[in-house]
Amino acid sequence: MSEKLQKVLARAGHGSRREIESLIKSGRVSVNGVVAKLGERLEDESSVVRIDGHIVSAKVQEEVICRVLAYYKPEGELCTRHDPEGRRTVFDRLPKIRGSRWISVGRLDANTSGLLLFTTDGELANRLMHPSRQVEREYLVRVFGEVTEQKVRNLVKGVELEDGLARFEDVVYAGGEGMNHTFYVVINEGRNREVRRLWESQECTVSRLKRVRYGDIFLDKKLPRGGWMELDLKEVNYLRELVELRPEKETMLDLSKDNTSRKRERARSQKIRRAVKRHEERVSTSKGRSNNPARRKPKKNAGEQGARNKHR
């Protein structure tokens, strides 16, 4: 099987297909030492592909299994592969894989926690992030300020931000007292700090923000902060169908619904928790307490699921 070079590189996470096409047109991509041409096809993984002289991963479709992780990002972690100041990044705790790499589906601010998806398929990541797909993202947000019915109507109708009109698809009150209020809000694009800026437009300050859903993938209440779990084939194909990609036939998971599998999954969850704890202890030892963000025990979020179900 052969595939177009730009498609292979986009799936490997080196940019969107249009960005890769631009790189090829600029002569910045080579295959086996020869400058690549737009539309060139790769036959197998034996070809050596370089971008700006650096060897990059490039596998044709038959050699790639699309994998997706759901990660519970804690506050304080950065959505970058490498930080020059040595701060924690969301990639630090992810499992190592050979012949591929994890690609984040969008980003979350350092001060935002919650669900962050990772995949080995760059094309899937790019499509899920693209505004034209209008994939819903749901957040649990705590705001400080006076929240009136008119302000909520403004947020649903749409307000003009510096980068254009923005709005919430849904706003549901989830409790609060005094000037502190908690809401579930839904957006269908991923502009920078969009949730925070929308509330700021109504003279309200976001004091806590947590993503709880991406499409129909929810943050699992059993997942600890800093923990991850791999999605099964059904969930992976739900995401692929959502953005019009052909379904996968294989998965790296082999979990049925029997009791043995459930026990195995519980043991896996406990293993993740222990790994997270060991990681935090290593970071604390190497950097000292002064460089560590404050840590809190994860709260049980069964109530969040119930509150969401009420307005879906």
Curated annotation (Swiss-Prot):
It is an enzyme of class 5 (isomerase). It holds the Pfam family PseudoU_synth_2. Its EC number is 5.4.99.22. Keywords: Isomerase, RNA-binding, rRNA processing. GO terms for molecular function: 23S rRNA pseudouridine(2605) synthase activity; RNA binding. It comes from the Bacteria. It catalyses: uridine(2605) in 23S rRNA = pseudouridine(2605) in 23S rRNA. Residues 3-74 form the S4 RNA-binding domain. The active site is at D109. Residues 263-277 have a biased composition (Basic residues). Gene3D superfamilies: Pseudouridine synthase (3.30.2350.10), RNA-binding S4 domain (3.10.290.10). Residues 254-312 are annotated as: Disordered. GO terms for biological process: enzyme-directed rRNA pseudouridine synthesis. InterPro entries: PsdUridine_synth_cat_dom_sf, PsdUridine_synth_RsuA/RluA, PsdUridine_synth_RsuA/RluB/E/F, PsdUridine_synth_RsuA/RluB_CS, RsuA_PseudoU_synthase, S4_RNA-bd, S4_RNA-bd_sf. Responsible for synthesis of pseudouridine from uracil-2605 in 23S ribosomal RNA. Belongs to the pseudouridine synthase RsuA family. NCBIfam families: PRK10700.1, pseudouridine synthase. This is Ribosomal large subunit pseudouridine synthase B. The gene is rluB.
